[in-house]
C-alpha cells in the first residue's frame, strides 16, 4: 500500500504568502520560499503553491518564486493558479515545479487537460475541483475561486477529468473551506468510488482527526491543509505520528 501524503498549501499573492504564517523563527513571514523550506525540513511529503495573483506582471514573480523554491525544497512541488495554456505548464515545469494544477481552465476547455496530459505526462497534471453541495449527494463545480457556478455535476466531472488524463484530483469543498469543521467526507467518498486516480482532500481541516477521517472515511490518498500548519497549531511530524497511530501508512 502506498504511503498517504500530507501536503501543506501556500496561497501566494505577488510573491507573498497571504494566509498568515506564524512560524516564530521566520523573520519575514511573507516569503513563500522560507515557509516552504520550513515545511520541507518538517518532513512534508509534498508542497502545494497556489498563485492567486491575477495580473500578468505577477506571473513573472511566480516563475522566480518557483525557481527559488525548487532550489531549496526537495519534495514534490505542485504549482497552480492562472494556468490556462500549455505554455504556462511548460514554464512552470521548467522553473522547477513537479506538478501543475489546472482549475478554471479545465472547465472552460476540458481538452486542455487531455493535451497537457499527452504532452507532459499524467503524473504532472493535477486537476483542481472546487465543489459546492447542492442537494443530497449532489455537488456543483464552481470557478473563479468559488464565486461562479457552472451547472456541472462534480461527480460526473471527476470521472471525465480522470478519463481526460488527470493524474490526480485536488478536491476542495467550498462549503467546508475555512470552517475548521473537517473535509466534506461524503464528497470525497463519492468521488473515490468513481475514479481510480489518487485524490487529495482539501478544505476544512481544524484538527488532526479531520486529516485521519479524510483518509480513513473519505478514501483520500493525500490530505492538504493550510492554517492548521501556518499558525503553528500543529507540526507536520505531529500530524504524521497521529495518522500513523491510527494505522495509516505514513513516511515518518
UniProtKB/Swiss-Prot annotation:
SUPFAM superfamilies: Ribulose-phoshate binding barrel. GO terms for molecular function: imidazoleglycerol-phosphate synthase activity; lyase activity. GO terms for cellular component: cytoplasm. It is found in: Cytoplasm. It catalyses: 5-[(5-phospho-1-deoxy-D-ribulos-1-ylimino)methylamino]-1-(5-phospho-beta-D-ribosyl)imidazole-4-carboxamide + L-glutamine = D-erythro-1-(imidazol-4-yl)glycerol 3-phosphate + 5-amino-1-(5-phospho-beta-D-ribosyl)imidazole-4-carboxamide + L-glutamate + H(+). InterPro entries: Aldolase_TIM (IPR013785), His_biosynth (IPR006062), HisF (IPR004651), IGPS_HisA/HisF (IPR050064), RibuloseP-bd_barrel (IPR011060). Pathway: Amino-acid biosynthesis; L-histidine biosynthesis; L-histidine from 5-phospho-alpha-D-ribose 1-diphosphate: step 5/9. GO terms for biological process: L-histidine biosynthetic process. Its EC number is 4.3.2.10. The keyword Glycosyltransferase does not apply. The keyword Signal does not apply. The active site is at 11, 130. Keywords: Amino-acid biosynthesis, Cytoplasm, Histidine biosynthesis, Lyase. Pfam families: His_biosynth. Its main location: cytoplasm. CDD domains: HisF. IGPS catalyzes the conversion of PRFAR and glutamine to IGP, AICAR and glutamate. The HisF subunit catalyzes the cyclization activity that produces IGP and AICAR from PRFAR using the ammonia provided by the HisH subunit. Heterodimer of HisH and HisF. Belongs to the HisA/HisF family. HAMAP family: HisF. This is Imidazole glycerol phosphate synthase subunit HisF. It comes from Acinetobacter baylyi (strain ATCC 33305 / BD413 / ADP1). The lineage of its organism: Bacteria, Pseudomonadati, Pseudomonadota, Gammaproteobacteria, Moraxellales.
Amino acid at each position: 500500500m502506498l504511503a498517504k501524503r500530507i501536503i501543506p498549501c501556500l496561497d501566494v499573492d505577488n510573491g507573498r504568502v497571504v494566509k498568515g504564517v506564524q512560524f516564530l523563527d521566520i523573520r519575514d513571514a511573507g516569503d513563500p520560499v522560507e515557509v516552504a523550506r520550513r515545511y520541507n525540513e518538517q518532513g512534508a511529503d509534498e508542497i502545494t503553491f497556489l498563485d492567486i495573483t491575477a495580473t500578468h506582471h505577477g506571473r513573472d514573480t511566480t516563475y522566480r518564486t518557483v525557481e527559488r523554491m525548487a532550489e531549496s525544497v526537495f519534495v514534490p512541488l505542485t504549482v497552480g493558479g492562472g494556468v490556462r495554456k500549455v505554455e504556462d505548464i511548460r514554464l512552470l515545469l521548467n522553473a522547477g515545479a513537479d506538478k501543475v494544477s489546472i482549475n478554471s481552465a479545465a472547465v472552460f476547455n476540458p481538452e486542455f487537460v487531455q493535451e497537457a496530459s499527452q504532452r507532459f505526462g499524467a503524473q504532472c497534471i493535477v486537476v483542481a475541483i472546487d465543489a459546492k453541495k447542492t442537494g443530497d449527494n449532489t455537488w456543483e463545480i464552481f470557478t473563479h475561486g468559488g464565486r461562479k457556478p457552472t451547472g456541472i455535476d462534480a461527480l460526473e466531472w471527476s470521472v471525465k477529468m480522470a478519463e481526460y488524463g488527470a493524474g490526480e484530483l485536488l478536491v476542495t469543498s467550498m462549503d467546508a473551506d475555512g470552517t475548521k469543521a473537517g473535509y466534506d467526507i461524503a464528497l470525497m467518498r463519492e468521488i473515490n468510488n468513481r475514479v481510480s486516480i489518487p485524490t487529495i482532500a482539501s478544505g476544512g481541516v481544524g484538527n488532526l482527526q479531520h486529516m485521519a477521517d479524510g483518509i480513513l472515511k473519505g478514501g483520500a490518498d493525500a490530505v492538504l491543509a493550510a492554517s492548521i500548519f501556518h499558525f503553528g497549531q500543529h507540526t507536520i511530524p505531529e500530524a504524521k505520528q497521529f495518522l500513523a497511530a491510527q494505522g495509516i501508512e505514513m513516511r515518518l
